[in-house]
């Protein structure tokens, strides 16, 4: 079997609320860490979410 191109990553809120999203990322084209601005329902505003490893 071939190695999977897409991997699942955890996007953790930079507001330190403990909230996170799970996203897919193409490991061949996106070699750097993913950063997205998304809504954090705990903080009730849009904040940056940074990539972390799923344990």
From Swiss-Prot:
Choose any GO biological process term that the UniProt entry carries and state it: translation
One Gene Ontology CC term in the entry: cytosolic large ribosomal subunit
Gene3D superfamilies per record: Ribosomal protein L33 (2.20.28.120)
| InterPro entries cross-referenced by the UniProt entry | Ribosomal_bL33, Ribosomal_bL33_sf, Ribosomal_zn-bd
What is the protein name stated in its UniProt record? Large ribosomal subunit protein bL33
- State the signal peptide span: none
Family the UniProt entry places it in: Belongs to the bacterial ribosomal protein bL33 family.
Which Pfam families does the annotation name? Ribosomal_L33
Q: Give the organism the record lists.
A: Nitrobacter hamburgensis (strain DSM 10229 / NCIMB 13809 / X14)
Is Cell membrane given among the entry's keywords? Answer: no
According to the lineage, what is the superkingdom?
A: Bacteria
Instruction: Offer an example of a GO molecular function term for this protein.
Output: structural constituent of ribosome
Task: Note whether Transmembrane occurs among the keywords.
Answer: no
**What are the entry keywords?**
Ribonucleoprotein, Ribosomal protein
């Amino acid at each position: 079997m071939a190695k999977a191109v897409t991997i699942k990553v955890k996007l953790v809120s930079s507001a330190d609320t403990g909230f996170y999203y799970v996203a897919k990322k193409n490991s061949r084209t996106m070699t750097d860490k993913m950063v997205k601005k998304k809504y954090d329902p705990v903080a009730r505003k849009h904040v940056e979410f940074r990539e972390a490893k799923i344990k």
